[in-house]
């Protein structure tokens, strides 16, 4: 272990907001969870009813004939024969009035909303989404975060990897994938920080659960919110510390801490009932700690993995993570603050709104603002819990793990060039070619992959592969990173010792000491987890899904700066699994993109996974 003098202030840029709880302006404005959900549903078809089921409030473990909470969903999926169809129309709006009363110069919306439709399906359904890109100059692609895309790699939505961007001014394509998993997730543009401008939405796949509940409240997304355009922010963060978010939207709404304009998200609880709430962090940079005053939450799913029930007082959500929780409305009928706080001394983000909050209202109680502000939750130090245990177990041996160059992915920050902040993994920063994605190489049999695509080829078939990710022990400073894998869930086998995120202590994996820290006996399994600041993380995934799968930091500015690799899993098998229909559609979109790109007025100036327009440095004032 090494301890470095902290240079973290260069990145944080300001004092961290304390782990404070709600002390909001006195306004009673509220917006109900159901109202917000119904507003976002416009543009999608209603969920088709399914056959009568054994899934009832007293027995959520059962689902349908032959399928329940113990079914291995990676092996068996209900055959519903149902397709849930949606149409997404992407548009740009200038001088848009935001939910907290501040006009934004430009936003990019799906079907006219700051969040797109909530995609709802049942376990086993097929989801079909036609995306029409009516943006002015930006291409787009839609990634279905956490969806494994078994045998549908070309529908993963990672431009420059699995497809060319959908060109603007009317370009379109249709994504199709099977809901082989169930739980809560989200979708977003992978053409950028573009999702920070509004090209984002939620996914709810109904299925069994590990704990009974009476009422499903649906999705509850939380996101950082900036008054400046996200693409401009990415340009700014190439050479400057990222600014704190201007506000935090909870289920699409917020109160402005300076003016009192806007509304609190309101969730109505039925006294005596158990409520399922699907909490998501759909941010570009902010990580959150959440808690409900005078209530506990019982976790039943982490990302899209059902877990054995685990009761907590608070939760940490990294960017991209989701938790399904059950809340028992057994307290005195009243109004309670749902608090969003920040930890780690701003090492994983902060907001200029010091008290983001929502209101949980017991039906029948008087209206108004809660009076009990609660107490600060424990500081999670920018680390997600390792205590969750999946219902469907996976176990692997760990005592024989050997660190080698071919299974180690070092993460380093390069401050030697222009732009100032360049993030490298395995010695290289990713920089994809929108007009020649990796799939193009697969289809043509060309194995001369560019170094800039940062490919890690994995040829093993149906084997557990182990990956050690290490933050640079010699770098000027070290930050935590929310690492997300496409195409798989991974096992979280272990990480370096839990220390304060801002301490700048450094740890390198030492088998003599750290093998004892590993857990291969049904460890946490998910698609996003935290690489500790100054530390290491050991993951494993099984090579059972041929494809080109990104593995990247989900902080928009970091992946824009190169922090990603592309696992090319079993390329020969991948070629055989690409249908003629998918190949034809891939070529059509690429032909349209290649015809458009020479006319685009803005140059490509980043990794390609986070696209933004060029702005002059003089447009920016550092806070």
Swiss-Prot record:
Tissue expression: Secreted protein; extracellular space.
Record-listed Cu cation 3 binding positions: 190, 486, 552
Matching Pfam families: Cu-oxidase, Cu-oxidase_2, Cu-oxidase_3
Signal peptide boundaries: 1-22
Catalytic activity, EC: 1.10.3.2
Gene3D superfamilies: Cupredoxins - blue copper proteins
Matching InterPro entries: Cu-oxidase-like_N, Cu-oxidase_2nd, Cu-oxidase_C, Cu-oxidase_fam, Cu_oxidase_CS, Cu_oxidase_Cu_BS, Cupredoxin
Record-listed Cu cation 4 binding positions: 481, 553, 558
Protein keywords: Copper, Disulfide bond, Glycoprotein, Lignin degradation, Metal-binding, Oxidoreductase, Signal
Gene Ontology CC annotations of this record: extraorganismal space
Necessary cofactors: Cu cation
Binding of Cu cation 2, residues: 145, 188, 554
pH profile of the protein: Optimum pH is 3.5 with 2,2'-azinobis-(3-ethylbenzthiazoline-6-sulphonate) as substrate, 5.0-7.5 with guiacol as substrate, and 6.0-7.0 with syringaldazine as substrate.
Keyword check for Ligase: no
Residues reported to bind Cu cation 1: 143, 484
Paired cysteines (S-S): 54-62, 164-590, 348-382
Cofactor note: Binds 4 Cu cations per monomer.
Reaction catalysis annotation: 4 hydroquinone + O2 = 4 benzosemiquinone + 2 H2O
Entry keyword Disulfide bond: yes
Family per record: Belongs to the multicopper oxidase family.
UniProt-listed PANTHER family: LACCASE, MULTI-COPPER OXIDASE
Function as written in the Swiss-Prot or TrEMBL entry: Lignin degradation and detoxification of lignin-derived products.
Protein name (database record): Laccase-1
Lineage: Eukaryota, Fungi, Dikarya, Ascomycota, Pezizomycotina
Gene behind this protein: LAC1
